[in-house]
Amino acid sequence: MHAYTLKAPAKINLLLEIIGDRPDGFHELVMVMQSVNLADIVELQPLSGDRIELFCNHPQVPCDQSNLAHRAARLMQEQFPGKGGVAITIDKKIPIGAGLAGGSADAAAVLVGLDLMWGLGLTQAELHTYAAKLGSDIPFCVSGGTALALGRGEELTPLPDLDQLYAVLAKYRSLSVATPWAYKTYRQQFSESYARDPEALEKRRREGHSVELLAAISHRDSQKVPQYLYNDLEKVVLPEHPQVQEIRDLFQSFGALGTMMSGSGPTVFGLADSRSKAELMATQLQTALPDPDLEILVTKFCSSGIQLLS
């Protein structure tokens, strides 16, 4: 068996609309997800027996069974017994606790890598099925690009690529927002707006905030797409964390094509149509907020998910 090295891109949400509750306790969502070039590098090496060993260069990333990458390897061993063990090495580039799906991307890389290493020949639909057992973002991280995501996020429809856009990502390293808290607080404050039956849910899917954004994406209109960014979770996170609102306001004042908090945060992104404009915006933000705790990264939209490097 060969070793494999894979690129695992981060993702941002261009749209996150909460439209109702699900029987499983999760929310019914309408999302548009987007891969970016910022990525972890995940290396897989075969091991004898059924050992799973995990290594990461970031001290705050757990290397035990709580890590999604470890759980992905265990799931694959359970589904395909006797294929052997694996050593997983993660070179962490995606900020942790940032709402950028770094852990989900690593798990997706393990699924794709073990499919290759073990010669399973799984289809993308089969990979998505296993990914959905692990987490809502992981099916998207497998295939990446630009996609409409429904349900918990596992029902994916590919959309035209938007890889001409750049994003400046900004996050205070010491700030984290617990995703369960964000959704629970939203439910407490806004559940009266939820769709209550299948017909109402379908109507919200067809006629909600995604309509204009999906139309702009269908035309690959890089000027209009940023005008239709939308995230329901901003309603609960921004009042609680004014420093996130401040970054958003600054991106607007610097002339970003669009700006929004990604997912449950706390990362905020500002969009530009060229690298030079994105880098200027990053410099302006650094000057306005010269705080060493603030991490600022310039990246580009990309059109694929997990990529084989070697």
UniProtKB/Swiss-Prot annotation:
Pathway entry: Isoprenoid biosynthesis; isopentenyl diphosphate biosynthesis via DXP pathway; isopentenyl diphosphate from 1-deoxy-D-xylulose 5-phosphate: step 3/6
Please report a single Pfam family linked to this protein.
GHMP_kinases_C
| UniProt catalytic activity | 4-CDP-2-C-methyl-D-erythritol + ATP = 4-CDP-2-C-methyl-D-erythritol 2-phosphate + ADP + H(+)
What does the entry list as the binding residues for ATP?
A: P95, I96, G97, A98, G99, L100, A101, G102, G103, S104, A105
Q: Name one GO molecular function term.
A: 4-(cytidine 5'-diphospho)-2-C-methyl-D-erythritol kinase activity
EC annotation?
2.7.1.148
The record's keywords, sorted A to Z, are: ATP-binding, Isoprene biosynthesis, Kinase, Nucleotide-binding, Transferase
The entry's family comment says: Belongs to the GHMP kinase family. IspE subfamily.
Q: What is this protein called?
A: 4-diphosphocytidyl-2-C-methyl-D-erythritol kinase
Name the species this protein comes from.
Acaryochloris marina (strain MBIC 11017)
